[in-house]
């Protein structure tokens, strides 16, 4: 099953069943707070990591830490 952070009507972070975390954008200040809380809650890192993944067009495997192009 996927884990999805949805802010308003937008899927912002998606963690696939095989562990790939993708951030689709940073959007509004409120959404950035949601991203930060989500990353802390699930132990995936922090907002800065999600922002870096988005800006660099990358995805991260939450099981291995591998970061590859999205």
Language-model features and meaning:
Residues 1-70:
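Terminal leader/tail segments of proteins
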